[in-house]
Each structure stands twice: as structure tokens, then as C-alpha cells.
Amino acid sequence: MSWHQAVWNEPLIFEYKGKGRIGFKIPEEEELKKEISINIPEKLRRKEIDLPELSELEVIRHFIRLSQMSFGVDNGMVPLGSCTMKYNPKIEEEAELLTQNLHPLQDDSTVQGILEVLYYMQKWLAEITGMDLCSLQVPAGAAGELAGVLMIKKYHETKGRGNRDEMLVADTAHGTNPASASMENFKVIYIKSNSEGLVDVDILKEIVSERTAGFMLTNPNTLGLFEENILDIAKYIHSVDAKLYYDGANLNGILGVVRPGDMGFDIVHLNLHKTFAVPHGGGGPGAGAICAKGEMVNFLPYPLVEKKDGKYSLSYIPKYSIGKIATFYGNVGNVVRAYTYILGLGAEGISMIGKMSTLATNYLISQLKNVRGLELIAPYRPRKHEVVFSAKTLAKETGVTANDVAKALLDRGFYAPTIYFPPNVEEALMIEPTETEPKEVLDSFAIAIKEIINTAYSNPKEILDTPKNTSVKRLDQVIANHPSSVTPTYRVKRLREEGKIGSLK
């Protein structure tokens, strides 16, 4: 496929030099004083607000140009493994806009509509995951992980178990799990995979002890494989009254087919910004949910919506709640997006997500499994939502690495897959097509991979020089990631240009 990205010499919006141009008239200070009785002390007032002066047309053109130099799901396939970059139906945006004039401090009686949405989302997500109750208070995925860890920690504290200081984490779990456990001072112990890419149950049995607080894993795992021994794993964890935590990063591969709660999981966190089609990866913020079963319901973050006498209220606080993970009630706008997604698909549509995402992955595998230079752990095992190929042989024979393959894909109109993760796969290319990509796109992606690898064997320099068709060409990654080069704000950029902050050349 022939593809070239736009290249605009577009300045930062703060660098526009116009004067007296406006797109929106802000009331003058004297006008504001007449309307509101706020007198800001002189020492707290800004002398100069330092905002650019632009017309509405200039602002529109600025952001349109930036969008043309960007890439997202609306442009083409984004096969980022463990990210579930599916298409986000645009009707969700209309539904989310309905929340814009609501305020979280309004009295419950004035926001019955949104409370009803939250109430049913709590119920629907519990039903989908096989849990008893869900809290929507967590704002994103990593916050959901932390909430789960806090719940496990508090559970053992209520039992007087100060010795429960070990958190087991599968080496094929989601990448942020160890960090979440470490934040609560747990000693992280990795459970290695066997030759099949699954949790090694024999190793698990040896490590589980009276010091084990819980086990964090996801199913399917990060290799896209279903943990077929999950019921035995749950039995071993529960034998010492530890808790089994489910990371929802990979739920898309089984959604509507099997449920974590039926596998023995005690806590489930969900990413509404992955599985339930809320925009993310530059289109954020995300949104999360944390669900619990049995006695772990008592530890959920508050508040939760309850219904009494036909009225909804944010009055339910679980007995041993870990408290709030964020302010107010989570990212409510994104909860509404996910609500719209579930409502639009219905039970029948939801039941097809896991099946279609699995079909897409295995179709891609059928196209790529015999490609020279690529290897696959347990190639005879079907995958679920994603697949991880190793480009180790390709790198050894041609010098073209997984990173180079990813760069070359950009030149062909595809976003790059996740690379070098999980760490137990050398030169990893983690590909997740999702259920929303049509067969023709999957075929084009497979053809692109084959072309890149064939070129790597015949003319590796051509691949090493990519990307050429993108707005930004290949960066010096050492300089780009060095602390003295990272420029997070316009003010930092300006200070660098003025020589007031050093930079790596």
C-alpha cells in the first residue's frame, strides 16, 4: 500500500505571532467584577497571561495539521499488543456530551439520570465478569491494579496477618503489575512460564506459602495463550487464603465466552478504555472498574451507587473499603461511553467480541507462522486476542531487529506493534488486531510484514533506513530519551532555546 504522511512546518500554538486576533471574547476584568464579588489580591495576580492571539480559523488549521501528522485507529490499523486499539463508535461521543453540564457536587436528587447509568454499569460489568459487585471509582488501568493490591493488603490486615508480604506475579502478566505491587511494599516474586508459555504450576506450588498475599495474572496471558490450568491455580492460591487478582488488559480475548469470576478470581480490574471502546493512547483519559467477589466486596473503593425505593444515591460504602482511589466518582464521561457501547451491542454483540478477536488473531497467525526469521512459542496452540512473534532469528541473520520491523511498518500505513514485551520473548513483536479490523486489512498487514522480512534478507539497509514516509523520521533514541532532552512543556522548550536549561546535543 502506498502511503505518505503529511509534513507541515507547524509551530507550537504558543509561537504564533498575531496580535489582536480573537476567536472568543473574554469579559474584561471590570465587567467580571460587576458579575462576581471576587477581588483577587494584587500579589496573586498574573501580570501577563502569555497566551497566543489567534483567530478561530488559525486554531482550526493548527489542530487539523497536527492531526494529519498523527496516526490513530481512525486512520488505520493500530496493532499494539495488550492495548486493544479497537474502533471507537462515534455515537459514544454524543452520549458523553450529555454529561457536560453535570457537577459531581450536585445533590443526588438532581442527577438521577447519570446515577442510573452508573448503577447499571456496576451491575452489567459484574455480570460480564462473573463477579458480585463493581466500583467505577478508579480512573484508569494502573489505578485499578493499585486498588486491587490495596484490597488484598487490607484483607490480610483485617485478619491480623502482618507476615503476608509476598505478591506473586506471572512473568506473562500485564507489564505494570509488579510496579503496582511494589507501591504497597510487597516483595514481588515472579512465577516463570513453562515451555508452553503457561504458568508453571509445579513452580507455583513450590512458592505458595503462608507469606503469599495474592497472585496477579491475566487470562489470556500476554502471549495470547489461555491459562488452561487456571482452576488448579485458583485452588493452590486459595489453599493458603491468598487472593487471585485478574488484570483486565486481555479480557477482550474471552469477552462474552468465559468469565474471570468462574475461573476462581477474587478481584477483577477492567479497562473501559480498552475492552469497552473508550478512546485511549492519546485520545484519553481512560476509565477503569474494579470488581470483587464474595468477602472481597467489603473492600471495594467507595462510593458505589445503590437503589432504594426507586431512587439512586451515592451512599453505599463497603464495610472495609480502601477508600477513594481518585476524586469524586471516576471518569464518568468515559463510563457513559462504555455504557453506550454495551447498550449498542447488547448481549448477542458482546458475546461475539471474544470470538471475533480470537478469529482475527489466529487468521493473522495462519498468514505469518511460516515466514522466515519469525518464531512462535508453542505454534500448535491457538491464541486468543494477540500473538507474540520473536524476530530473534531475523535479527541474527540480517541485523534487522524487531524495532526495525516496527519502523518499516510505519512506512506502509500501519502503526507499529508493541515491541520487546513481554521480556521473556527475545525481539518480541506483540500484535493485537482486535475484532473490528476487516479481513482485507489483516491481509494487507500480513503482506507488509512479509515484504519487510523479504527485504531484510535481500537489502537490510533499506529497512534500517525506515521510516521515510512519516512526518517524523527515525530519531536518535539515546538523545530522545535522555533527561536533558525531554521537553514536556512549551516553557521548558523556550528555556532550552534561551540557554537557561541544558540539552544533550
From Swiss-Prot:
Q: Which UniProt keywords apply?
A: Oxidoreductase, Pyridoxal phosphate
What is the originating organism of this protein?
Answer: Sulfurisphaera tokodaii (strain DSM 16993 / JCM 10545 / NBRC 100140 / 7) (Sulfolobus tokodaii)
Signal peptide positions on this chain: none
* Family classification: Belongs to the GcvP family. C-terminal subunit subfamily.
Q: What is this protein called?
A: Probable glycine dehydrogenase (decarboxylating) subunit 2
Enzyme class, top EC level, equals oxidoreductase
Q: Does the keyword Oxidoreductase apply?
A: yes
Q: In the UniProt record, which is one GO cellular component term?
A: cytosol
Q: How does it assemble?
A: The glycine cleavage system is composed of four proteins: P, T, L and H. In this organism, the P 'protein' is a heterodimer of two subunits.
> What's the Enzyme Commission number for this chain?
1.4.4.2
Enzymatic reactions: N(6)-[(R)-lipoyl]-L-lysyl-[glycine-cleavage complex H protein] + glycine + H(+) = N(6)-[(R)-S(8)-aminomethyldihydrolipoyl]-L-lysyl-[glycine-cleavage complex H protein] + CO2
The cofactor required is:
pyridoxal 5'-phosphate
Record-linked SUPFAM superfamilies = PLP-dependent transferases
Alphabetically, which GO biological process terms does the record hold? Answer: glycine decarboxylation via glycine cleavage system
Query: What gene name is listed for this protein?
Result: gcvPB
